[in-house]
Design a protein with these regions (language model features):
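Cytosolic regulatory regions of ion transport systems
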Residues: 1-152
Length: 152
């Protein structure tokens, strides 16, 4: 009994309950979105895209697997999921079935290709913009279903 009480107090002191409740609230807010954009990646390019979306009041949710970048996105006030964007479940949790578009702004062309394939397999009519660093990858991203590409 004492161990259980100690564990609960420690959990509360470490802020885990606040994090858990915050994440639950964030997931509930994401579930309400309709016609939004999913932004995959909150690196240099993703931050700039998020800034533009925020300025234009475009509803969006960020998917970021890096804990530090995830924390930065939430600190910046954005709805964000801390998971891998190439995972179909992550895209579903971000509301892909209700989303109008997706921006694949991950650091590698291969990751952006995989996210594009995943997004188009889940929702073929979603509009996808994919970051591309290598000219050779641009054609592959278009074949995978990217409607537009962007080069940083």
């Amino acid at each position: 009994m004492l161990y259980a009480v100690t564990a609960i107090v420690q959990y509360l002191l470490e802020g885990n309950l606040e994090n858990m409740l915050g994440r639950r609230h964030m997931k509930a807010e994401i579930a309400k979105l309709k016609g939004h954009t999913i932004l995959c990646g909150y690196g240099k390019v993703g931050k700039e895209v998020a800034r533009v979306f925020a300025n234009e009041q475009t509803p969006f949710v960020v998917i970021e697997s890096d804990e530090k970048a995830y924390n930065k996105a939430t600190d910046d006030g954005f709805l964000c999921l801390n998971t891998n964007a190439s995972n179909d479940e992550a895209l579903k949790e971000a509301g892909i079935m209700n989303a109008k578009s997706l921006v694949a702004a991950l650091g590698s062309d291969a990751d952006n290709l995989y996210v594009t394939l995943s997004a188009k397999s889940l929702k073929p009519d979603i509009f996808v913009v994919a970051r591309v660093d290598n000219e050779e990858s641009e054609a592959k991203l278009k074949r995978a279903g990217a409607d537009r590409t962007m080069s940083p």
